[in-house]
């Protein structure tokens, strides 16, 4: 199975996977509006391959059921909240 990958012109780190190059007919209009102008990245062979950011089985399933897969970046890490949590844990340990 081949898959074409496009990156979003509006949302950094967002990628759209579709089964046929330049065929966005299965992608909802609202999603295309949010995605912006797709910029072609590459075509990949899905068989026997791993992807860095997403589970390839989820991509395959979505391509087969929905006709596309949308990869969004993970949410940013809130360093301030992490620091507060570490500090609170440290204070609890110091009290023990």
Swiss-Prot record:
PROSITE patterns: YCGL. Residues 1-84 form the YcgL domain. InterPro entries: YcgL-like_sf, YcgL_dom. Pfam families: YcgL (PF05166). It comes from the Bacteria. HAMAP family: UPF0745. PANTHER family: PROTEIN YCGL. This is YcgL domain-containing protein VS_0884.
């Amino acid at each position: 199975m081949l898959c074409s990958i496009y990156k979003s012109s509006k949302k950094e780190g967002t990628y759209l996977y579709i089964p046929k190059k330049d065929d966005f007919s299965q992608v909802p209009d609202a999603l295309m509006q949010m995605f912006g102008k797709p910029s072609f990245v590459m075509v990949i062979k899905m068989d026997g391959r791993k992807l860095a950011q997403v589970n390839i089985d989820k991509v395959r399933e979505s391509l087969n059921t929905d006709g596309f897969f949308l990869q969004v970046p993970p949410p940013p890490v809130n360093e301030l909240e992490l620091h507060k949590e570490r500090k609170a844990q440290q204070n609890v340990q110091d009290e023990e």
